[in-house]
Amino acid sequence: MNLGALVDTTEWLKQVYIDTAEEEGWKAGPEHFGYLLRCFVADTDEKAIELGKEFMWTIEHRQRGPMEHNDPPGYQSRASVEIKAQRPTGNVAGAGGLGVGLSYDQLRGVNNIIVGNPDTVTQKLTEVIERLSPGYIHIYGNEGAMGHKETMRSIELLGKEVIPALHEVPLRPYDDRPRMDTISSGTAGLAP
């Protein structure tokens, strides 16, 4: 599972998973790959966009300290660090592919934060599913000062409207997907 990296980076990491599985004699597939993203649903896009700004709390508060406090030595194997060093770079990668340094609107633009009414959220999550084909989508649904009432309404809308619609989106086997060396990574959705 990929924990909150940008979709471009996740696409690259998924290919690492596919290649590693193949090298080890396993068949990679959606049933063994998931994606975590921030998502909030409200009755209107405007309300969700406003409440969704609270997703920036972690970046603005908890992750402000020295990097070694967030990712101390020894938390990752040397092999993991080598893989991280190969990640795509550039504007869209933002701090190793996690989007640190990108604005709220930029993170929304690349579907790292998905907010809106049920139709908007369904459309945006469908885009992520069609691109990554994850067997699991994990939703980080509240942060900062989001109110309990609004968070419970988001959960209700996800459960009653969004998730049932997503069950209609087919997952493609990974051997039907283009290899990363044939996919161009870019800054789609990012403001200059």
Predicted regions: what is each one?
Residues 8-134, 167-192:
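An alpha-helical appendage that flanks or caps ligand/catalytic pockets
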Residues 43-47, 146-157, 188-189:
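Short glycine/threonine-rich loop-to-helix capping motif typified by GTGT followed
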